[in-house]
Amino acid sequence: MALPLRPLTRGLASAAKGGHGGAGARTWRLLTFVLALPSVALCTFNSYLHSGHRPRPEFRPYQHLRIRTKPYPWGDGNHTLFHNTHVNPLPTGYEHP
């Protein structure tokens, strides 16, 4: 006895069901405008308030940091590729801008 073959249809696909996504889209739109956008604005404002200039920490010449066994192949050989004079010290200390 042979089993009846069903036609290949998309019976479980969401496109086959009607009126499926209306409530979910409304919920996510509400969450975006009520929760996400004010949170981004609040974080931006907080970042703006705390964006003042902070003094550099005191330089401490630790023996295990900033070891140069051979020079870098660019520049003077002492600065790293993405060296920032305001943040990154050299082995001898901070640079004076």
Swiss-Prot record:
Residues 13-24 are mitochondrial matrix. GO terms for cellular component: mitochondrial inner membrane. Residues 50-97 are mitochondrial intermembrane. GO terms for biological process: mitochondrial electron transport, cytochrome c to oxygen. Keywords: Membrane, Mitochondrion, Mitochondrion inner membrane, Oxidoreductase, Transit peptide, Transmembrane, Transmembrane helix. PROSITE patterns: COX6A (PS01329). Pfam families: COX6A. Gene3D superfamilies: Cytochrome c oxidase, subunit VIa. It is a single-pass membrane protein. Pathway: Energy metabolism; oxidative phosphorylation. One of its GO terms (molecular function) is enzyme regulator activity. The keyword Glycosyltransferase does not apply. Disulfide bonds: none annotated. The chain crosses the membrane at residues 25-49. It is found in: Mitochondrion inner membrane. Residues 1-12 form a transit peptide. Belongs to the cytochrome c oxidase subunit 6A family. Component of the cytochrome c oxidase, the last enzyme in the mitochondrial electron transport chain which drives oxidative phosphorylation. The respiratory chain contains 3 multisubunit complexes succinate dehydrogenase (complex II, CII), ubiquinol-cytochrome c oxidoreductase (cytochrome b-c1 complex, complex III, CIII) and cytochrome c oxidase (complex IV, CIV), that cooperate to transfer electrons derived from NADH and succinate to molecular oxygen, creating an electrochemical gradient over the inner membrane that drives transmembrane transport and the ATP synthase. Component of the cytochrome c oxidase (complex IV, CIV), a multisubunit enzyme composed of 14 subunits. The complex is composed of a catalytic core of 3 subunits MT-CO1, MT-CO2 and MT-CO3, encoded in the mitochondrial DNA, and 11 supernumerary subunits COX4I, COX5A, COX5B, COX6A, COX6B, COX6C, COX7A, COX7B, COX7C, COX8 and NDUFA4, which are encoded in the nuclear genome. This is Cytochrome c oxidase subunit 6A2, mitochondrial. The gene is COX6A2.
